[in-house]
């Protein structure tokens, strides 16, 4: 296949898995459990972070106008904020969830598995950032929809993470809190540093 055709297939596959995770998480987690754990970075997380950044960049330019260097600087700052918060939040959440598995649930230390889980579980955050980047008026609705991540994590906890049924609710709540809070905390710190450094 040509390189262009392969890229089109990759983009289609990314959106297919994202839509499946949102519409039918159990079936999506079954498919994900069969794939290479390291594939999550290049096949899903990095492209989704890139799309989130692009969406916010375009939305910021549209909101602030195209004229002047200030509008471009603002758009770049917003783009970096989203990319840094999602990237750092993803790795921080994965690290903390792995620690949670080891300490609270007496499971093996398995960073690649947890990175795969966290990457795909963040699908709700990724999709909302893409939509809010272009349509910022939906921020309140997005805040409420953010908690759909709990259902995605609930399904993934049994299928991919193999959490025992008795521990599943506790794992789901704690993991969901980490997946929502870690990017938010990093975004807050990034914003404060941006203000201080300007």
PLM-predicted stretches and their roles:
Residues 184-198:
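Juxtamembrane boundary at the C-terminal end of a transmembrane helix
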């Amino acid at each position: 296949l040509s390189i262009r055709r392969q890229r089109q297939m990759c983009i289609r596959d990314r959106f297919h898995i994202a839509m499946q995770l949102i519409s039918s998480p159990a079936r999506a987690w079954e498919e994900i459990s069969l794939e290479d754990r390291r594939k999550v970075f290049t096949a899903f997380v990095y492209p989704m972070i890139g799309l989130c950044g692009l969406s916010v960049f375009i939305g910021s330019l549209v909101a602030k106008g195209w004229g002047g260097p200030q509008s471009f600087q603002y758009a770049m700052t917003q783009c970096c904020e989203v990319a840094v918060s999602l990237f750092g939040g993803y790795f921080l959440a994965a690290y903390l969830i792995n620690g949670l598995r080891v300490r609270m649930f007496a499971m093996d230390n398995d960073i690649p598995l947890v990175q795969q889980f966290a990457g795909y579980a963040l699908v709700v955050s990724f999709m909302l950032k893409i939509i809010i980047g272009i349509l910022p008026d939906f921020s309140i609705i997005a805040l409420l929809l953010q908690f759909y991540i709990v259902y995605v994590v609930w399904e993934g906890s049994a299928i991919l993470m193999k959490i025992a049924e008795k521990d599943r609710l506790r794992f789901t709540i704690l993991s969901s809190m980490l997946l929502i809070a870690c990017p938010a905390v990093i975004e807050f710190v990034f914003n404060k540093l941006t203000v201080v450094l300007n």
